[in-house]
Amino acid sequence: WRERTNAYVEELTSNIQLAYEKTFGAHSINAVIGFEAIKRDTPKSWLHAIPASNSLHLIYYDTIDKYEDTGNNTEARLGWLGRFNYNYANKYLIDFSARYDGSWKFPPNHRWGFFPSASLGWRISEENFWKESKIASVFSDLKIRGSYGLVGDDNVDGYSAFDYMTGYDYKQGGGVIDGSYIIGTTPRNLPVTTLSWAKAKILDIGLDVAFLNNRLSGSVDFFRRIKTGIPASRDDVLLPEEVGFERPKENLNSNVHTGYDLLARWSDKVNDFHYSISANFTYSRFYNWEQYNPKFSNSWDEYRNSTWHRFGNVNWAYEADGQFQSWEEIASWPIDNDQKGNTTLRPGD
């Protein structure tokens, strides 16, 4: 037998932008507005044949006994964007930006999301009082900056495109009836009608500094990201067992990433040879933040298994007092480790 799978990726992307720049005196402004559209198709087909001869690895139309068009997973996104930047004498920096995005994944009433952000910067080293001070001979550059924004994510876990629709899923197994293979269908889960974008609020505060005519430079950043709208089900909503489906997903949970970045760089040249050496360090911790209606059997269960406002990806484990060195030590050990009188233990355990 022979089989062949043909798969394609067809993506059409449109990106239109209009930019404006203007400088007057010490003032400089920059503005951009744009439109973006993405459509992606992934058609796929599979065919099977029983050739008259196995000597040639070919598939002929006359010998094809099965053909399956496994469908076309269409994706589509549409968005509007805008940005405004203001710069005064390279000292005061202001930037505003925003996106208005729509995703094919979500139901029509929850398909669009608005995601703004803003950043401010102050280059202290460009101030006259700084240039006139003795400390200016040490610092080549000093800048304080901060930003805060909202970012959307439609790649939500536990949710597939068109889960907001009712009906049936095609090509879900099958069976042989009267000598013919019949492709099966299954009813879809309860429609997800309220799920929308997961959103991340991101705060960043940083300091840029340079010394020795910018040969030695570095930066320090503190960041905090709060992601809300993580899909989860309302387990306090009771459904009869006869329903046979899980509870629909909603934007209920959240998590947090917080930490800091450090960067140091040395740049110089020897004659016409330019070189730079840099090092960076990042510390980040992940927290499971809000969870919808967690349930525990008792306070000990909550202490051991709750993830509410706790570090994520932390597992409980045993603390080892050491290894048994002899049979005598095992025989005198007061704790029944294996629940069999320690008869399964050996030196080295």
What are these regions (language model features)?
Residues 103, 316, 323-327, 332-349:
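Extracytoplasmic gating/loop element in the C-terminal half of outer-membrane beta-barrel translocons
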Residues 1-319:
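Extracellular/periplasmic, surface-exposed regions of secreted and cell-surface proteins
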